[in-house]
Amino acid sequence: DAPSLGRVIDYCIDHGAAAVCLPAYGGEFYKLSDAERIDVVRLAVNHSNGRIPVIGQANHPSSRIAIDLALQMQDIGVDLISVAVPRVFGLGEDDLLRYFIPLSNALSVPLLIQDFNPGGPTVGPQFAKRLHEECPNFRYLKLEEPMMGSKAAGIIEATAGGVSVLEGWGGMYMLELIPSGICGVMPGVAAFPVLDRAYRLHIDGNIQAAYEVFSRILPFIVYQLQHMLLKNYQ
């Protein structure tokens, strides 16, 4: 539905989003064929026409296919590539480095890695340091887990600021992670204007006001995170 996608992108631009990322988990990428995912990215790049950075999400358990998708998206004109850690199998960090190093080296745009693993461990400071040393265009790590303040700070320290940390999971842990140095939040479109206001209030030192704004959107986030598809029935 190209017209609807265009309206969503316009909404993001009009409300001050820093970038758009698609098709990701919230956009139900797993229901699209690889060709459809490329079409979605092409529509976004063409419609945005340089008005907002576009992040192409190239998730795939096969590194070869992820590289192919990422290169197609790069050729279309995305500003950054995002790839989720393949959590189909129990992979250690050495295995994940073997997955991501060829992918990152194939790209000329920056790489964002998303680690969405509600049932297990996520990558940490040493992984970020090793991959960033090998692949300087690995610039962002999006984590989605509770109580990760020390991990976020550790990643930033281990990479000397070369890798920035983004908070996912709908923005639920945003306020507790701002003091740890996260550079932003990647929520779904519906919640982002309110979260953006709370984020800006907090970084400006208006912590109580940020909490009051955040507390109004938190029930919505909790409801939505019970199941990804619930956002379709709000």
Where are these regions (language model features)?
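A mid-to-C-terminal "edge-of-domain" accessory segment
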Residues: 230-234
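Active-site beta->alpha loop and helix N-cap motifs at the rims of alpha/beta catalytic domains
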Residues: 1-120, 130
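Catalytic alpha/beta core domains of metabolic enzymes, predominantly
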Residues: 105, 117-229
